[in-house]
UniProtKB/Swiss-Prot annotation:
GO terms for cellular component: cytosol. InterPro entries: Aminoacid_DH-like_N_sf, NAD(P)-bd_dom_sf, THF_DH/CycHdrlase, THF_DH/CycHdrlase_cat_dom, THF_DH/CycHdrlase_CS, THF_DH/CycHdrlase_NAD-bd_dom. Its EC number is 1.5.1.5, 3.5.4.9. It comes from Geotalea daltonii (strain DSM 22248 / JCM 15807 / FRC-32). It catalyses: (6R)-5,10-methylene-5,6,7,8-tetrahydrofolate + NADP(+) = (6R)-5,10-methenyltetrahydrofolate + NADPH; (6R)-5,10-methenyltetrahydrofolate + H2O = (6R)-10-formyltetrahydrofolate + H(+). The lineage of its organism: Bacteria, Pseudomonadati, Thermodesulfobacteriota, Desulfuromonadia, Geobacterales. SUPFAM superfamilies: Aminoacid dehydrogenase-like, N-terminal domain (SSF53223), NAD(P)-binding Rossmann-fold domains (SSF51735). GO terms for biological process: L-histidine biosynthetic process; methionine biosynthetic process; purine nucleotide biosynthetic process; tetrahydrofolate interconversion. Pathway: One-carbon metabolism; tetrahydrofolate interconversion. Catalyzes the oxidation of 5,10-methylenetetrahydrofolate to 5,10-methenyltetrahydrofolate and then the hydrolysis of 5,10-methenyltetrahydrofolate to 10-formyltetrahydrofolate. HAMAP family: THF_DHG_CYH. This is Bifunctional protein FolD. Keywords: Amino-acid biosynthesis, Histidine biosynthesis, Hydrolase, Methionine biosynthesis, Multifunctional enzyme, NADP, One-carbon metabolism, Oxidoreductase, Purine biosynthesis.
């Protein structure tokens, strides 16, 4: 059976380090500040925002929440972002996605100052990531890389197969693996013979949002499996993008769902906010 990569335990360790760093800054009169902007009443978004608020409080980061009505105009949101860009108490800005349809998401993300882009989605930060000189790295893929490092996985020379090419996870994590000298294959909906691609991987990173799409039988014996997917099946069951039980029988290490990558995402958001405050 595979070793379980415990995201909760790794996140707790990193948060302990963040708490200590925040306390050091506080002794110098600096409190890292994160502004979280929520537009509308999306239930999942409200849950995520409250989790981020609690996480900030737990490590000593100042959290400023802006909850705007669903009918907020694009111009009103851009004005708020401009104000937050100029606010010296704020070191990180996060706009919770998805946004209502009357607001252009791309325009909003581009309006955030690259130096306060705690989510790492600004084109400037994406470009820096691609050339190997990152300022902010997107939180979920960053969390994946930290998990691999903490598990003792050296990517140099390894075959890494990333399934899913989203701008939020798939593409950035592929570039991050490339910078660690892995040989990366990025698979997507038009990829031919996905099973054969996955079967050659030393490390599989699944981020497609399709319940148990990647079959356990595809996994090479001894491979490491990182499952970013969180999919609801029925009323209460959560599953990943990988067939967990069958994959566990073949993999050397695997992340569970829930309790794997999820806890790392908010942890890396806290880390990005801390790093921004240290740069000031």
């Amino acid at each position: 059976m595979a070793k379980i990569i415990d995201g909760k335990a790794i996140a707790a360790k990193i948060r302990g380090e963040i708490t200590a760093e925040v306390a050091k800054l506080a002794a110098q009169g600096i409190t890292p500040g994160l502004a979280v902007v929520l537009v509308g009443e999306d239930p999942a978004s409200k849950v995520y925002v409250s989790m981020k608020e609690k996480a900030c409080k737990d490590v000593g980061i100042f959290s400023d929440e802006y909850k705007l009505p669903a009918e907020t105009t694009e111009e009103e949101l851009l004005q708020l972002i401009d104000k937050l860009n100029k606010d010296r108490k704020i070191h990180g800005i996060l706009v919770q996605l998805p946004l209502p349809k009357q607001i252009n998401t791309e325009k909003v993300l581009e309006a955030i100052s690259p130096e306060k882009d705690a989510d790492g989605f600004h084109p400037y930060n994406v470009g820096r990531l691609v050339i190997g000189k990152p300022l902010f790295q997107p939180c979920t893929p960053y969390g994946v890389m930290v998990m691999l490092k903490e598990t003792g996985v050296d990517l140099a020379g390894k075959e890494v197969v990333v399934v899913g090419r989203s701008n939020i996870v798939g593409k950035p994590v592929a570039f991050m693996c490339l910078q660690q000298n892995a040989t990366v294959t990025l698979c997507h909906s038009k990829t031919r013979d996905l099973a054969a691609k996955v079967a050659m991987a030393d490390v599989v990173i699944a981020a497609v949002g399709q319940p148990e799409m990647i079959k356990g039988a595809w996994i090479k014996k001894g491979a490491v499996v990182i499952d970013v997917g969180v999919n609801r099946v029925g009323e209460k069951k959560l599953v990943g993008d990988v067939e967990y039980e069958a994959a566990s029988a073949r993999a050397s290490a695997i992340t569970p769902v829930p309790g794997g990558v999820g806890p790392m995402t908010i942890t890396m958001l806290l880390y990005n906010t801390l790093e921004s405050a240290k740069r000031r």
